[in-house]
Curated annotation (Swiss-Prot):
Gene3D superfamilies: Ribosomal protein L10e/L16. PANTHER family: 50S/60S RIBOSOMAL PROTEIN L16, LARGE RIBOSOMAL SUBUNIT PROTEIN UL16M. Pfam families: Ribosomal_L16 (PF00252). Transmembrane segments: none annotated. This is Large ribosomal subunit protein uL16. It comes from Desulfatibacillum aliphaticivorans. Binds 23S rRNA and is also seen to make contacts with the A and possibly P site tRNAs. Coiled coil: none annotated.
């Protein structure tokens, strides 16, 4: 699972996701990619599940780049605990995604194989995405 080695603050505020991605919106490594169409949080488990789905479909062919990293901790209170009494304990890590951000890139495979692998990966993610190709 992806997670930061060291963080300055153990707990952070949720923040707001407004506007579109300023960076990371073009294909830098591969020929094909998966681009976000809406904003949201993607957990480290979802990133890993999508990566596994892609690699299993292409059967060790081609190369895959993960363009996002979960650097924001999210907290969760235990089950059946009343409201209040402070913020919960850190539960995991999320990547903040804005529209236009490239999530994954692929190269070394045909368009049909890449499109199907990226479609399988998109089903593992909680946001709407589209498949893009280098023109």
């Amino acid at each position: 699972m992806l997670s930061p080695k060291k963080v300055k603050h153990r707990k952070v505020q949720k923040g707001r996701m407004q506007g579109v991605a300023r960076r990371g919106g073009v294909l830098n490594f591969g020929q094909f990619g998966l681009q976000a169409l809406e904003c949201g949080f993607v957990t480290n488990r979802q990133i890993e599940a999508a990566r596994i789905a892609m690699t299993r479909h292409v059967k060790r062919g081609g190369k895959i780049w993960i363009r996002i990293f979960p650097d924001k901790p999210f907290t969760k209170k235990p089950a059946e605990v009343r409201m209040g009494k402070g913020k919960g304990a850190p539960e995991g890590w999320v990547a903040v995604i804005k529209p236009g951000r490239i999530l994954y890139e692929m190269d070394g495979v045909s368009y049909e194989l890449a499109a199907e692998a990226l479609r399988l990966a998109a089903h593992k993610l909680p946001i709407k995405t589209k498949i893009v190709a280098r023109s």
